[in-house]
């Protein structure tokens, strides 16, 4: 599911809200989550999972085409850890 599909589905399930209203709400939620991650925080959605930022150190990489060694700079990447309820629902039939 992509963001536009989520917005359309939420608007259909909540006829008292327009699609524009749902779009604004989803946009604000995502912006707040991104803002929290930018500030070095963590976003936890109980039962679903937690988003945080992890640091990747600088390292030596290799260009697969030429074999040349290149320096890869240190960077921050988003990290998702699934919640217990989500894992349980995904593995319910096993």
Swiss-Prot record:
- Alphabetically ordered keywords of this record: DNA recombination, DNA-binding, Transcription, Transcription regulation, Translation regulation
Instruction: Output the GO biological process annotations, alphabetical, semicolon-separated.
Output: DNA recombination; regulation of DNA-templated transcription; regulation of translation
Query: InterPro entries, alphabetically?
Result: Hist_DNA-bd, Histone-like_DNA-bd_CS, IHF-like_DNA-bd_dom_sf, IHF_beta
GO cellular component, alphabetical, reads: chromosome; cytosol
* Coiled-coil regions, chain positions: none
Q: GO MF terms on file?
A: DNA binding; structural constituent of chromatin
Q: Does the keyword DNA-binding apply?
A: yes
Q: Write down the HAMAP family for this protein, in alphabetical order.
A: IHF_beta
Quaternary structure per UniProt? Heterodimer of an alpha and a beta chain.
Per the record, the similarity remark reads: Belongs to the bacterial histone-like protein family.
Quote the function comment for this protein: This protein is one of the two subunits of integration host factor, a specific DNA-binding protein that functions in genetic recombination as well as in transcriptional and translational control.
The record's section on PANTHER family has: DNA-BINDING PROTEIN HU (PTHR33175), INTEGRATION HOST FACTOR SUBUNIT BETA (PTHR33175:SF5)
Listed name of the protein: Integration host factor subunit beta
The lineage is: Bacteria, Pseudomonadati, Pseudomonadota, Alphaproteobacteria, Caulobacterales
